[in-house]
């Protein structure tokens, strides 16, 4: 419908993508021949999972099921619910398996923070979609694109890995999409910028206003509120409204995700060789319970994040590049030696260059050590803290009823000033809200974003809604689970 492009690689069209990639057009005769040559057992039934709640996704699953049946492959599909991240991405402890996840095929999307993240998640020992057995050639290619700040070397590396991944077909890219921000005519950003809505940028939320109601209160209604728990911010740092406004970051970036200025830090500096990053944190930072937010919270958060199973690959690359990270991870050290604290000065010394280190810290939200220090990092998402989290951002939780509503109000002691909108009310949903059009039609939706084309067309027909397309790196794919089953 004019709002998507056919994909022939993970990476979107642009200077980092080579020409002439195989696009694997549908060819049932060739598929049948290859299945015969592979002695495919037609009694096997593949389990395909997805996590979107819209009818278009169900229709797509039904179509894929029919295409597979036509060539002699059985497939059933089901929607994941609950801790979707763990069900999708928990990796096997051994590169030879067995698998921890229960699915064979998964449909979803990847909208990475940095282009390297399209591929770094396939590194041996990583999440569930890493090749099994291990692919050392791929690991070396990942090392090239994640290990140099040299743009030309990165470009050559992306050309090589894009072609190799498409030749090996470890994952099947389907199409590229824009994101569409929607806002009601009640919302005024008052000069705040627009950008990639899946991540955090300097959007000036504290200065937004809405048309006051009959009581003079400014309320903004949105979605992506919690269903069973608040999603932790270390895998999808800006996908959910709570992760955008309940938590804060050391630095911020522009709408294109280029780091621009300090946030919780009052100053930061990266050495010319990229090996030392220094933050001077603001004085009197506070968590929403009034307790101090310190450099020790940041250090603890970095160390804890490295042990969380579903950690954003960009964060993992940055933190594992620190001096002493390897010893910390293998248990031979109690902390990461490359992190040092002197009062409100946090210094990070790296063993190797990470070209996206500032980008990582524009998205990484420290969590309160006080409330989570006794939690097993492997089970971070299951901690009771995520029923009503205490954050550091411009809004705090006032009231929440899981799978019903979330009310957030300004945090009076926020270090960049009290936010002007009196309440943000979020209805429960994942990033694809099945109730979006119903709520928008009833004028109960003021802000959000979507990639659902049918929803975009409906919103564009509502006089009180504005739709603003944003170009983002975002690819819909089918992932293949390659580990042996138990």
PLM regions and their residue ranges:
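Ligand-site clamp/hinge motif
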Residues: 74, 383-386, 411-458, 473
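N-terminal lobe/hinge region of extracytoplasmic solute-binding protein
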Residues: 221-272, 390-391
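Alpha-helical secondary-structure segments
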Residues: 1-8, 34, 44-55, 148-169, ...
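A structural "hinge/loop" feature
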Residues: 182-200, 223-241, 264, 291, ...
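Aromatic- and charge-enriched surface segment that lines or borders ligand/interaction sites
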Residues: 267-314, 347, 442
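A bilobed periplasmic-binding-protein/Venus flytrap-type ligand-binding module shared by bacterial periplasmic
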Residues: 126, 133, 177-178, 206, ...
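Detector for C-terminal structural segments
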Residues: 1-19, 52-66, 90-226, 238-244, ...
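Surface-exposed binding/hinge segments that line
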Residues: 299, 315-374
């Amino acid at each position: 419908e004019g709002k998507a492009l056919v994909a022939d690689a993970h990476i979107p069209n642009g200077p980092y993508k080579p020409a002439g990639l195989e696009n694997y057009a549908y060819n049932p005769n060739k598929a049948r021949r290859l299945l015969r040559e592979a002695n495919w057992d037609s009694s096997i039934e593949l389990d395909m999972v997805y996590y979107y709640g819209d009818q278009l996704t169900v229709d797509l699953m039904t179509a894929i099921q029919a295409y597979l049946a036509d060539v002699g492959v059985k497939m059933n599909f089901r929607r994941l619910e609950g801790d979707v991240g763990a069900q999708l991405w928990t990796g096997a402890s051994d590169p030879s398996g067995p698998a921890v996840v229960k699915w064979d095929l998964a449909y979803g999307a990847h909208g990475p923070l940095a282009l390297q993240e399209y591929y770094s998640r396939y590194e041996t020992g990583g999440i569930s979609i890493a090749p099994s057995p291990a692919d050392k050639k791929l690991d070396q290619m990942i090392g090239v694109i994640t290990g140099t700040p040299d743009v030309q070397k990165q470009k050559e590396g992306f050309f090589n890995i894009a072609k190799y991944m498409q030749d090996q077909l470890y994952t099947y890219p389907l199409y590229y999409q824009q994101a569409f921000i929607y806002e009601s005519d009640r919302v005024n950003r008052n000069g705040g910028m627009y950008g990639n809505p899946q991540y955090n940028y300097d959007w000036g939320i504290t200065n937004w206003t809405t048309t006051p109601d009959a009581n003079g209160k400014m309320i903004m209604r949105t979605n992506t509120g919690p269903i069973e728990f608040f999603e932790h911010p270390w895998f999808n740092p800006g996908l959910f409204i709570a992760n955008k406004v309940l938590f804060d970051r050391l630095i911020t970036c522009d709408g294109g995700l280029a780091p621009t200025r300090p946030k919780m830090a009052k100053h930061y500096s990266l050495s010319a060789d990229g090996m030392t990053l220094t933050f001077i944190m603001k004085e009197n930072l506070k968590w929403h319970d009034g307790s101090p937010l310190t450099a020790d919270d940041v250090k603890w958060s970095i160390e804890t994040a490295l042990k969380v199973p579903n950690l954003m690959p960009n964060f993992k690359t940055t933190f594992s590049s620190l001096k002493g990270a390897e010893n910390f991870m293998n248990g031979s050290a109690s902390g990461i030696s490359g992190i040092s604290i002197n009062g409100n000065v946090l210094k990070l010394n790296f063993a190797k260059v990470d070209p996206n280190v500032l980008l990582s810290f524009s998205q990484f939200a420290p969590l309160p050590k006080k409330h989570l220090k006794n939690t097993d990092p492997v089970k971070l998402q299951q901690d009771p803290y995520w029923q009503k989290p205490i954050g550091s951002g411009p809004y705090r939780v006032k009231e929440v009823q899981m799978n019903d509503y979330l009310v957030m109000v300004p945090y009076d002691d926020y270090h960049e000033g009290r936010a002007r909108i009196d309440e943000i009310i979020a209805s429960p949903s994942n990033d694809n809200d099945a109730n979006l059009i119903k709520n928008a039609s009833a004028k109960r939706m003021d802000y959000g974003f979507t990639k659902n084309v049918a929803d975009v067309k409906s919103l564009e027909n509502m006089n009180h809604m504005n739709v603003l397309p944003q170009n983002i790196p975002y690819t819909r794919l089918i992932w293949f689970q390659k580990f042996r089953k138990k």
